[in-house]
Amino acid sequence: MRSSWIEVDLSAIEDNVRTIRSFLKPGVKLLATVKGNAYGHGAAEVPRFLESLGVDAFGVAFAEEGVTLRESGVTKPILLYGRTFSDSYGLLFDYDLTPNIFDVENASEISEEAVKRGKTLKVHVSIDTGLARLGIDLKDGTKEIIEQIMDMPGLEVEGIFSMFANSRVRSGFEDIDTQMCIKQFEKMVDLRNQLEKDGRKISCWHIADSAAAMLFPQTQMDMVRIGSSLFGAWITDVMPKDVSFRPAMSVHSRLACVRPSPIRGSFTSLMSIMT
């Protein structure tokens, strides 16, 4: 047995899922973000456990992470947050992964791959409402770009999503952060109204993470994405007193030895620590 190890408490994760569900509206789906090896908690084991708890979908950074989930036995939808490049197109179809699309060129290439394979692939389109990262810029013509993607053969635009710039609401910046979140959400609603006016129906709209779902319940839309809160992270400076999350990870080590050190003695290489 190693002298140091990490333990992951699945009961803590279960409690955290229960806590998050307690402030979700009826019918709102739950997507568990498990990128980065499930935040270091184990990308093979934790998602399987979350699936047994009834989580509706998973989010990862790129296709190879999605493959790990599939090979571990996960069957629920897996959304890729990052861009999928051409050398990973095959993985989308072989492992039933849902790419994030935010430009026509990428969409067209994946559409061609779908047609070549005789398949239809579910995709989500991301829009930039203020984070200034990935996503179609919200400006004149955004609706038309999305409609162009929706009309491409072999693609089914199942969802449209965005990410908040700062939903954690920092202490001392409550007004600024709240206004930004509401502004971003209103942009999403406006786009949804524009598309529905044209008869375009999208089944899954999502922008809220754990903090937003709790602090701004109107932003929950069709699905909420949860990440670090699954594992016990403090998700906002203004957490309600009746809400808490349990840390799922603990680090353990066995003591190797204890030895005294004289005054002005040194230890470790390069004498970097002095008493």
Label every PLM stretch briefly.
Residues 64, 82-87, 104-107, 127-129, ...:
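Short, acidic/turn-prone active-site loops that include or flank metal/cofactor-
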Residues 66-68, 107-113, 117, 179-183:
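Active-site-adjacent beta->alpha loops and helix N-cap segments on the catalytic face
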Residues 66-67, 86-89, 107-108, 142, ...:
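Short, well-ordered alpha-helical microsegments
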Residues 2, 36-48, 113, 122, ...:
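Active-site loop/helix belt of alpha/beta enzymes
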Residues 1-98, 120, 156:
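A charged N-terminal "starter" segment
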Residues 98-108, 138-144:
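Glycine-rich anion/phosphate-binding loops
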Residues 252-275:
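Functionally critical, mid-to-C-terminal surface segments that flank or help form catalytic/ligand
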